[in-house]
């Protein structure tokens, strides 16, 4: 659904006031949701397992916990900067009726000394002249305990799930 920047800001402000939450954090969550929805329309939708803060925030509510990034595990392909960059370009370029553009800023290795290395993606989410930085951490090999589930993620500004 297309919302103007003023509509997005207004809805975020109302939700922030109602939940005693930080509007900037809510704006970041909204932009992360826009990227997550693009994943659901991509051929990689079954390869990404969302975990961490954004998932917990959606389950317990924004007044209880906020998050700064999207944490995911991937499966079915090698975790290399080149492959992840290719995948992110495909996902970010999926057109939805939200007028949001994602600009890829950086792709870097994280957890170099860990058993399960990862990739960090830095994007800017742009809605006209409103620009919000977001991060996506992608890892592989982590055990998902007890196991991954299909989850209907409730969107912040719309009465629907992805």
Label for each model-derived stretch:
Residues 1-162:
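Compositionally biased terminal segments of proteins
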